[in-house]
Amino acid sequence: MIFFKKKKKIGLAGWWGGRNEGDRYILKILKRSFGRDFDLDVINIPFRGDPSMIGYLNKLDFLIIGGGGLFTINFPEPFDTYDEWGKSLKTPFGFLGVGVQEVNERLSGTFASIIEKSTFFSVRDTGSYEISKKYSDKADKIFDLTFLSPRKITTSGNDRTMGVNLRVWNFDDRRTYDNSAWCHAINGLKQPKIKIPLSFLHGIDDRKAMEGIASGYSRTFSMGLYKKIGLMLGMRLHSLVFAVQNNIPPIGISYTPKIQRFFDDMNLQEFCLGINDHDKLSSLVERVNNDKKRIGPVLDGYNDHAHRAVARYIDNVVETIKNL
């Protein structure tokens, strides 16, 4: 008689419901990485930390949270109230390739508790690591999870055409982002442009943010759009990540720290613009176009290092969960 060992059931919790192409691809990678060895349940963040949800989580053998941005100025539900329900959670959990923007004083104790209770806690950039390691030596630095399986396509070598991604970011009085000024600066560039939207959620639809740009566009996302470009200007992190994975030089607009951190980790800090630096765009585009021979090897090295690091870490996570 042959006995089959029952697979452990693990939950994959993340930003899966936001119609964001970066998050969608992260989930695809997680399913591919863990689906062979485990049964998977997909869980959308945010979710409530009420007794019924905790009861559901306690039926899992393990809970993976991430990747992607998670700990921003305000933690998403239910991690903002972890101190209230954390002791009721019996299932072991770990954080995989997340971003930590900042930890305000009100949530510092909560954040410390979360890391200490985690089986593992890995972040996607050095800035997130520098914050996290102040709270626990469990913190590990890896890279964005999409580097496990880069979205490589065959580019056409059209160096003159620039891909553009803007996002809605002017819905808060505290934010100084001027969408119209960026559209004006982009329209002033002589080279051809293609709009590349990554997020389609109502209220923060990238297509809305790029209405003021006079260029070709797509109503949907496709990696095929990257075949047509030789330079990428982006706000959304994964618009830039997908360019880097195809050795396309990036220019970032740092609307949150994660964008600047991405460029810092590549040692390409000079190619990331501040949120109000639209007046510097034209000169920076010219600089990138003149510096592509230097940038190419930098991107190659980063891609290789990131892929190896994420692959090694996920292999270790699989073995860790198996052995619990």
Regions found by a protein language model. Name each.
Residues 1-324:
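Active-site anion-handling motifs in enzyme catalytic cores
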